[in-house]
Curated annotation (Swiss-Prot):
Transmembrane segments: none annotated. It catalyses: UDP-sugar + H2O = UMP + alpha-D-aldose 1-phosphate. Its EC number is 3.6.1.45. This is Uridine diphosphate glucose pyrophosphatase NUDT14. It comes from Bos taurus (Bovine). Belongs to the Nudix hydrolase family.
């Protein structure tokens, strides 16, 4: 996963995942504009494996995180994107700079599937757990990337067991996914969430906090 080679950066051509746009509007009599990205809404799934007394997370390399770290440590590195062709990054970092811990998640990019159906599909593809929509508890929905995408994300919760795991998961190779499933023991989950040196999404932090506040007491877990 962390073996990253031949890193180059270039302009984004036509993409099925995002479209850069500018919204022009008048607010309180003042003409304004705002650049944003049109993208898909998404779902996330927080799973608790009662067989292992652990929370199920995923770990994967995120190119955007990697590029952001390169630019943060070596300002101006992404200026190569102004070129017509992808240009090799002169300042590169180990692949670990782009690896993050996340909740199982997926885009709502398949018309006809409900939020619950997409969540179940992702739980199987990424983590290898068989879920039915009836297994899911809807936690909440919220806006993400409010300054850039304004997309909506819905979080679900599901309790699973080892008996429901029918494959190792790992994502779809044909879609470029390379995912490691992580079973986070409950006794170290709070420390994990609070550690600023562990690269993780806000969804992981919120999910762990929500679990201990809303689920653990009912299961007799502390």
């Amino acid at each position: 996963m962390e073996r990253i080679e031949g890193v180059a950066v270039g302009r984004c051509a036509a993409s099925p995942y995002l479209v850069p746009l500018t919204l022009h509007y008048r607010q309180n009599g003042a003409q304004k504009s705002w650049d944003f990205m049109k993208t898909h809404d998404s779902v996330t799934i927080l799973m608790f494996n009662s067989s292992r007394r652990s929370l199920v997370l995923v770990k994967q390399f995120r190119p955007a995180v990697y590029a952001g770290e390169v630019e943060r440590l070596f300002p101006g590195s992404l200026a190569a994107a102004e070129q017509d062709r992808p240009q090799a990054l002169q300042a590169a970092l180990p692949g670990s700079a782009g690896v993050t811990y996340e909740l199982c998640a997926g885009l709502l990019d398949q018309p006809g599937l409900s939020l619950e159906e997409v969540a179940c599909k992702e739980a199987w593809e990424e983590c290898g757990y068989r879920l039915a929509p009836s297994d899911l508890r809807r936690v909440t929905s919220y806006k993400s990337g409010v300054g850039l995408t304004g997309s909506s994300q819905t979080m679900f919760y599901a309790e699973v067991t080892d008996a429901q795991r029918g494959s190792p998961g790992g994502g779809l190779a044909e879609e470029g996914e390379l995912i490691e499933v992580v079973h986070l023991p409950l006794d170290g989950a709070r420390t994990f969430a609070d550690d600023p040196d562990v690269p993780k999404t806000l969804g992981v932090i919120f999910g762990i906090s929500w679990f201990f506040s809303c689920v653990a007491p009912g299961l007799g877990l502390q």
